[in-house]
Amino acid sequence: MPIDQIRDIVVRHGRLAASAADLTPTSDLYAAGLSSLTTVHLMLALEDAFDVEFPDRMLGRKTFESLQSIAEAIQELKAAA
C-alpha cells in the first residue's frame, strides 16, 4: 500500500499540527492533531481515493491511528473485494 499517497491524503484532510515530513508510518495521528471530525473527512477521502468502503468494524480509532494502520486496513479491504 502506498504510504506516500496515504500521507498526502492525511495531510490534506486531517488538519494535523504536524507536517507531512514529520509523519512516519507509525506516527500517532491523533497525537499529531487528528480529531473525530477530521477522521470522518479523512475516511471519506480514503474511500474515494482507493475505491473502498470502511465497514462499521473498522470505524474505530485503531484503524486511523497511523499511516501504517490505515494502509493495513485498505489492503485488507482490497484483498476482500
Residue ranges and their predicted role:
Residues 15-16, 34, 52:
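Helix N-cap/coil-helix junction residues
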Residues 21-23, 51:
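Short, flexible turn/loop "capping" segments at secondary-structure junctions
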Residues 24-35, 55-66:
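Glycine-rich loop motifs involved in handling phospho/adenylate chemistry
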Residues 1-20, 73-81:
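Thiotemplate assembly-line natural product biosynthesis machinery
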Residues 39-63:
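Phosphopantetheinylated carrier protein domains
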Residues 4, 37-40:
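Short alpha-helical elements of helix-turn-helix
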